[in-house]
Amino acid sequence: MDLGLYSIDLPFEFATKKEVGIIVPKRLRYRWELILGDSKIELPRLLKDLDSIDVFFHNSLHIYEHMMFEFKTAWPKIKKNGILISDDIHLNNSFIDFCKAVKCKPIILSANLGIIVK
């Protein structure tokens, strides 16, 4: 069983790994892997090596096409009863459109945060 925590982020000229993973608790850092690169390349590559995922959290480029790409790419690997979380859902209709496409009712936690349970 692979219990990993993965982040994909573009390299920042002045950011450190600590700044990028600030939300990762210290007790879980040993399971965390930071992958630097474009998620359009790195996300499919990562998912190819994983059997399934429990949680997918989108918090990268918040334009419609990119959000839909990440949702559509991650969704097939999300386990039954797994969750997809998206930040900044108020910026465009991608989250709601994706919920309709996969026939799942969205859970809107705030104006900018939504969840889908598979």
Outline where the language-model segments fall.
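S-adenosylmethionine/decaboxylated-SAM
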Residues: 1-118
